[in-house]
Amino acid sequence: MDYYGKRVATASSDATIKIIGVNNNSGSQHLASLKGHKGPVWQVSWAHPKFGSILASCSYDGQVIIWKEGNQNEWLQAHIFNDHKSSVNSIAWAPHELGLCLACGSSDGNISVFTARADGGWDTTRIDQAHPVGVTSVSWAPAMAPGALVGSGLLDPVQKLASCGCDNTVKVWKLYNGTWKMDCFPALQMHNDWVRSVAWAPNLGLPKSTIASASQDGTVVIWTCAKEGEQWEGKVLNDFKTPVWSVSWSLTGNLLAVADGNNNVTLWKEAVDGQWQQVTVVEP
């Protein structure tokens, strides 16, 4: 879904991307088909509209393609990245405060971060062997520093990433002087099978940082860090008794959507006592 909720981009195993217009009154209409990948497309992601009408896609073919809309509903391949040697499983645009910046996680174990320059080129930084058996998901931390709302003075935007992979772990990374370094010791490990999805919650400037992770083992874990520099603590939200494919936060960070292997999407909320409770099941 784009920023304005007007268009949906879909990724398919037939190697195509479709742009669909969504209208409250007349339903949906097909606007464009984007062809460029040579294998299943795993994920698509819209950039913030301040950068124009831009879409990123990643595929089993190892490529990441940046698509740009020229004339209305005419999409061009603005850039193709061939940095990865195997399937690129996850892409995530950074908070817009950090510029036009895309993180990519691959089955080759590496994470690459591409940042657009003013001259139209791209700078690349890498996290080599972030998860040696394969990276399954990446998610950016909010740009607003934890505690910025309750602190004083101006703080620089935060450049942090969460990742997960086939080594059953979640890891947190921070950019120090142009180099990505692990920011959690040890790696966050409460799952006993592949971690399929990781999502960093919006924190609205509050001191606590929160990450959700979903695993093949059927559990979703909520990781919290009370304040910068402290250890992350994990709590199992629920055991779904079936692989969990995806977790996603609401814009305010107080609702978590969970998609599981039984084709259910459930919404969860933290109660006053710190326990997580199911709020509803999302009906298709």
Each language-model region and where it sits:
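Loop/turn segments within WD40 beta-propeller blades
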Residues: M1-G5, S45-G52, A92-G99, S139-V158, ...
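WD40/WD-repeat beta-propeller blade-loop signature
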Residues: Y4, H30, P40, F51-I54, ...
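Conserved strand-to-loop turn within each blade of WD40 beta-propeller repeats
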Residues: A11-D14, S57-D61, C104-D108, A116, ...
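WD40-repeat beta-propellers
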Residues: I17-V22, V44, V64-E69, I91, ...
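Beta-strand initiation motifs
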Residues: N25-H30, N71-Q77, D119-T124, G178-C184, ...
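WD40/WD-repeat beta-propeller blade N-cap
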Residues: L34-V41, F81-V88, D128-V135, A141-P142, ...
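Solenoidal tandem-repeat scaffolds enriched in leucines and small polar residues
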Residues: A78-W173
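C-terminal interaction modules of eukaryotic adaptor/scaffold proteins
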Residues: A226-P284
